[in-house]
């Protein structure tokens, strides 16, 4: 998985409002682009009740900054801490060379995930913010898959990074909310979900939660967005 991290950085999104860093997100490029050319998946609590939201990502070593003219928040999400914590930002920006990746379907992929539970996300922790460098403000968080509750469409995973001070885990994880959670299946990079936050108010035990890719797909379909293909409908080209 480590050799794929450089590729994953291409999809990493920072969300801002004015001078405030709101959190992270992940770019997704649909196969046919029938509705929009690109989408950002993020956590609903990252952008809800904010105005003048901007999307930032890197292309060819340069930062691209675009306005989030519209966004869709899950109708099942009401306030921070609740389940179904997903938002979608459609973007009409032409990024032809951006490779597509597959979005997981748990009923199809779970057995392989259990055999290879390593996960990784790329986000923008608040403690790592560098004003002059978008690239160096990115950071990675390696995790291991733990479990899923399909009734609330939520996955549980545990971070395995050894260099986070146990007393400061809540602080150091701030800003990762909304980042894409990726796994590797048969050498293919696959989006497993969207990072929500720590389990409870204290992250000291390392338990984290995220919305499943299945819920992202369902939300895209219900809101007339381009919908991620199911396994067998697209081949990863990372």
Q: What does each of the following model-derived ranges do?
A:
Residues 1, 192-238:
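C-terminal cap/linker of serine protease catalytic domains
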Residues 43-48, 123-125, 174, 192-201:
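Short beta->alpha transition motifs characteristic of CBS
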Residues 9, 13-22, 35-37, 46-161:
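Serine endopeptidase catalytic core focused on the charge-relay Asp
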Residues 3, 16, 77-79, 169-172:
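Short Gly/Pro-enriched turn/cap motifs at secondary-structure boundaries
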Residues 26, 167-195, 204-207:
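Catalytic nucleophile loop of clan PA
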Residues 19, 32-38, 181-190:
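A glycine-centered beta-loop-beta connector
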Residues 153-165, 211, 217:
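Terminal helix/beta-alpha structural elements that buttress the NAD(P)+-binding lobe
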Residues 1-34, 218, 230-238:
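Protease-domain processing segments flanking chymotrypsin-fold serine proteases, especially trypsin-like
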């Amino acid at each position: 998985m480590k050799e794929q991290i450089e590729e994953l950085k291409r999809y990493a999104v920072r969300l801002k409002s004015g001078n405030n860093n709101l959190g992270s997100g992940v770019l997704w490029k649909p196969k046919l682009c029938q509705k929009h050319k690109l989408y950002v998946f993020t956590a609903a609590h990252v952008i809800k009740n904010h105005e003048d939201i901007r999307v930032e990502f890197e292309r060819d070593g340069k930062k691209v900054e675009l306005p989030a003219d519209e966004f869709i928040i899950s109708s099942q999400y009401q306030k921070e801490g609740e389940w179904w914590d997903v938002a979608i930002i459609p973007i009409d920006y032409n990024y032809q060379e951006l490779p597509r990746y597959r979005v997981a379907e748990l009923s199809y992929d779970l057995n392989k995930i259990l055999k290879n539970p390593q996960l990784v996300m790329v986000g923008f922790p608040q403690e790592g913010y560098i004003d002059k460098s978008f690239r160096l403000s990115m950071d990675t968080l390696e995790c291991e898959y733990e479990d899923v509750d399909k009734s609330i469409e939520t996955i549980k995973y545990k971070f395995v990074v050894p260099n986070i001070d146990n007393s400061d885990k809540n602080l150091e994880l701030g800003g990762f909310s909304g980042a894409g959670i990726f796994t590797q299946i048969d050498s293919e990079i696959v989006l497993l979900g969207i990072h929500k936050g720590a389990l409870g108010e204290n992250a000291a035990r390392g338990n984290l939660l995220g919305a499943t890719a299945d819920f992202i797909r369902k939300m895209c379909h219900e809101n007339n967005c381009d919908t991620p293909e199911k396994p067998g409908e697209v081949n990863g080209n990372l």
